[in-house]
Amino acid sequence: PKLIYVLDEDNVTEGTKYWHLTKLAAECTAKRMVPDYISAKIMKELKKGEVYPCMGCRSFLTVEDTQMNEDGRHKFYGRFNQGVVTINLVDVACSSEGDMDKFWEILDERLELCHRGLRCRHERLLGTASDVAPILWQYGALARLKKGEVIDKLLYNGYSTISLGYAGLYEMCMRMLGKTHTDAEARPFALAVMQRLNDKCKEWREAENISYSVYGTPMESTTYKFAKC
């Protein structure tokens, strides 16, 4: 679990009610690198007015109108992620040898490979009985299923997500354009790649009713796996 501190109107400026807690949080971050921070103002703009923490270090659930609490608010607690498959954008760029047309062709091929990997993760969960982890599936941590009931219905319709991870946006731009993704000349290319990832997730989701989403892969262990390949 990640330690999260939410910056909001009642704690973000000096003189507000919880300013003293913000100061303590900042002091703690300076010494221990935690907590992490969420801007309630920005998150509300991006997440239909909702503010909620991430799962682990950075994985946020999607806001689903099909998943609501009894009070009419969007449901987040109890939902989960089915897994991640990461596309190596650096390898796509290197494999294209700097040829832009070839880059997009290889990107689409690799995205379909990732889709197959995500399907493997999803299908591995199908048919799992709630009995394998009663605390999770029967006693409310993730759901309240009956004994012997399979978890399949929780894998569709937005209850859980499954993530297309990406890595190497900076290096991809450097290989293709010789500029960083924050440079004015390279930014449109970087955004176009991210849009392609989003569009693919949307396409798969509409076809399968599985909540595919884009995820910034942390890469601590994935880097080693990529290097071995």
Protein language model annotation of sequence segments:
Residues 162-175, 195:
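Contiguous, well-ordered alpha-helical segments that form the cores/surfaces of helical PPI scaffolds
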Residues 1-158, 175, 179-229:
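Conserved catalytic cores of very large enzyme subunits
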